[in-house]
Amino acid sequence: MSDSTYKAGFVSIIGRPNVGKSTLLNRILGEKIVAVSDKPQTTRNVIRGILSDETSQIVFVDTPGIHTARTRINRAMVDAAMTVVTGIDLMLLVVDATQKIEETFIKDICSKAGAPIYLVLNKIDQVTPKEKLFTVIEGYTRLYDFPEIIPISAQSGSNIERLVDLVREHLPEGEALFPDDILTDLPEKFIVAELIREKVFRLTNREVPYGTAVVVEAFAERENGLVAINATIMVERDSHKGIIIGKKGVMLKKIGEQARRDIERLLGTKVYLELFVQVQERWTERTAMLRELGYE
């Protein structure tokens, strides 16, 4: 196939928190590179996932959920999400098909768009009765003239291939933007930290996960092929430290075991993971700390 017919471009994935944006990206790539949990605001950074084949390269840009920001870290997350609304070739606006249509939010996003917007109706497997889906689609059709409305289930994979095909058709012709053998331009240490943070979100409750961050302090491959990783889970309060460690260290061990399994799948090798917990009071409001962690 000639280079002139090769397609490549940037596609942003935006939407409210907890609508399934990160699950969608992981499903498209066939690999977990983004932290996922049932708690909103799990994603904090702009994350690029790269899907390449013989005909095209799609650079998906996953963003933090757009929400009302009350803390410095939340403001940084929303700023990051809105930054990628411009300068891309296509936008995928992901909404939860089971939730009420947010007219003001949809109109606001569409008015700021600098590229065509495809509406992605996620969680269609949870819509009951199934006939209700037609009513949902009609509601969004009245709001904005979307070139495409694609019902999907990121969890089950339903209609994902159709979505990717439609995205690919829209891309401009051009050369690949990244090497064709990578899934993301993020360093492995970042993804490892994300996988650990995901387990904190999944296994702890209330405000605890929102005041945590993970820093990978050491990442080294030994002669026997084993990868040794030391990581620190930062929290804002002593009480949170106690919750994450758990009685007799049970919770920290559980976080470590589940994270290690995901990291081993990611790296394709055995992993030795050692976790520490450190208190950094009000780190979510400290500009220098947020910048160091890559949130600003």
Swiss-Prot record:
Provide this UniProt record's keywords sorted from A to Z: Cell inner membrane, Cell membrane, Cytoplasm, GTP-binding, Membrane, Nucleotide-binding, Ribosome biogenesis, RNA-binding, rRNA-binding
Write out the ranges of the annotated region (G4). 122-125
The protein's location, in the record's own words, is:
Cytoplasm; Cell inner membrane
Q: Does the keyword Cytoplasm apply?
A: yes
According to the entry, every stretch annotated as the KH type-2 domain falls at 204-281
Q: Which InterPro entries does the record associate with it?
A: G_ERA_dom, GTP-bd, GTPase_Era-like, KH_dom-like_a/b, KH_dom_type_2, KH_sf_prok-type, P-loop_NTPase, Small_GTP-bd
Q: Briefly, what is this protein's role? A: An essential GTPase that binds both GDP and GTP, with rapid nucleotide exchange. Plays a role in 16S rRNA processing and 30S ribosomal subunit biogenesis and possibly also in cell cycle regulation and energy metabolism.
List the protein's name: GTPase Era
What organism does the record attribute this protein to? Trichlorobacter lovleyi (strain ATCC BAA-1151 / DSM 17278 / SZ)
